[in-house]
Amino acid sequence: RQKLATPYWVTYQYSKELQSQPIHTTTHAGQEFDLVVKGTLRVRVGEHEEVLHEGDSIFYKSSTPHGMIAVGGEECTLYAVVMRPQKEKKPEKDTFEALIKAKQDRADHETVASPFVHTELDENGILKSIDFMNEEKFNFAFDIVDKMAEKEPDKLAMLWVSKHHEEKRFTFNDMKRMSNKTANYFKSLGIKRGDRVMLILKRHYQFWFAILALHKLGAVVIPATNLLMEHDLDYRFKAAGVRALVCTPDGQVADEALRAAKNCGTVEFLMMANGAREGWLDFDAEVEKQSDVFERTEDTACGSDPMLMFFTSGTTGYPKIAEHNYKYALGHYITAKYWHNVNPEGLHFTISDTGWGKALWGKLYGQWMCEAPIFTYDFDKFDAHDILPMFKQYNITTFCAPPTMYRFFIKEDLSKYDLSSIEYSTTAGEALNPEVYEQWKRATGLSIYEGFGQTETTLSIYNPVGSVPKSGSMGIPSPLYDVDLILPDGTPAPVGETGEIVIRTDKHTPCGLFMGYYRDEEKTREAWSGGVYHTGDTAWRDEDGYFFYVGRTDDVIKSSGYRIGPFEIESVIMELPYVLECAVTSAPDPIRGQVVKASIVLTKGTQGTEALKKEIQTYVKTNTAPYKYPRIVEFRDELPKTISGKIRRVELKG
């Protein structure tokens, strides 16, 4: 891994169709030297294009967008040498001293969360312990949002930007007033404590009005994505007993929901925000008519009462329903303060859509408990060119996105964008490839602080503020959870050995851990029994206690007595400049039991040849233990995925 350069033989097939199209470009770390051995090549580097013939060569910085196609009516073969960047010392924004000072400056600040949360830091400024008080009386909407409206009514709660770049600024007083009006509207319909209400609102600002209103009413919130189709919604309506739906008019989801609701006997109220349509109640118009006073009562839902349901995005079978109580919000205090490192005077941007649990990690609970405003961009489709200028435009200070988004960012020429406002960057949702971490750090001076959690939990493993993250590691256990690694026989996994990540609950059930799977005692017992919650994810830990992700328990490959995790192999393959996406699974083998199989999506214009397969296999052999190399390599146009974007490995096995 210390070698300075990697050589490749690359063949571009001639395509008549590509001759009239703009050359597709990509980026990667380091520098590149290309020598044409046979044929003719048109090369684009940045805004510059030229044609190379046999014997011609070109040398360029490969972080500049570049691409090439064969011209002249025949295939072109070239010898490419990719030179890895040297580890250069440069000023870093997230120096240990700076992070500790920032944390200490905020440590003694009395917040609206103080009556409920007590924390202790160690001598290095890293979170040592967290305890909760009065949690059985806790209701986030009343105890945090309404208290902030009393304390600082004009403080910014959310800066919202529409897909047309129209801006709206909402203060905490706005959030209190509009959530009260919305609660009164729901109440007028007869929606009450315990009723299940689904929200399909993308990143519309009405989502925040609705979820806070439902928390005040005691109704159970079910966030859902606008990507659902009729059969998805039909299952969800029936499985959860959904009584009401607030929906976006965007796309086709409203039509899908209307058809599904007609087949389901439980859905009584269909409300549409941001528009009016036949068959739907006009959410915006009706809310505006209501009183902005809604008082807390002695029997207001709180503590252990059900508050929230998420449909898990499992890769096999129908999704389960993870149910959370009102203490779930408290579990996200660590998420915001000790992982996102939010600044009450800054602006936090978590990119997730409200249909996913990750949105509540970064767009609501923890951030507002820390009195930090959030930034929301209500876009339709992710576009790095669209989002990157916003960091400077809106002075965004902390940022969280899944690794996929960072991968899109680093393929751009980041030198064109002013990212200097960003003080801290984090990621979760999938394992972070080391190559992405290194390229982002070189471009911005910022480490990416990885974290791990599930729909059933809050942040359970993380790289905390004040620590020095290890590239490729998802971090250390959060003090909120008693996290362990166990072998199949239930004994603790030794250092360096793969085990399943579990959370021990024999001493106490932490705020943030789910109540169980709704209406499914069997699945709940399978995952959580004997004082142990099984995550189904595997990892290994080093001598410093840092965890390194391996894969799902059913994704581990058992070949010739070896246990092989897919993520390490995927990370190596992702280092190759022509690989856009990959997934590693198992395939049956009569001699070895299983062998490693790599399913790969190539960058546009790259041909999946037998020679390229051998090159990939050789690269993996060279850069990791040889027994891990993929004996089967297949090229695909795309990888099968769940609605939430997780790769369906079960479809790739075999």
Q: What residue spans do the PLM features occupy?
A:
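Conserved AMP-binding A3 loop
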Residues: 168-173, 299, 307-331
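ATP-dependent adenylate-forming carboxylate-activation enzymes
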Residues: 201-202, 219-237, 249-256, 352-354, ...
